[in-house]
Amino acid sequence: MQINWLILDFKEINNFNLYQLLKLRSKVFVVEQNCVYQDLDDKDQKAKHIIGVFDNQVIACSRVLFEEGYYLIGRIIVEKKYRRKKIG
């Protein structure tokens, strides 16, 4: 299994991958984990995004923010069928 890892600023993410990334975040955080909160928090535009693409699909992602002298890693997710494969 060869995953293509992308590290991108928000403005560098193409529309196709952005849609898949947001869809995956909604699927995992809202549906699976029942975390009803505003995912779009205006921090994505300032973050670096680590995106794992396999078979032309976003299967993993996270974001890294630098705030007040610290790096914050968040929104870490892996598509359910790819978990427990040492991707995260």
Where are these regions (language model features)?
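Short amphipathic alpha-helix that is part of the acyltransferase structural core
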Residues: 1-48, 54
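Short strand-loop junctions, especially beta-strand C-caps/beta-turns
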Residues: 8-10, 76, 81
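Short, surface-exposed acidic/glycine-rich loop or hinge patches that mediate macromolecular interfaces
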Residues: 12-15, 67, 81
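Conserved beta-strand in the GNAT
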Residues: 51, 56-65, 70-77
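Conserved acetyl-CoA pyrophosphate-binding loop and the N-cap/start of the following alpha-helix
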Residues: 82-87
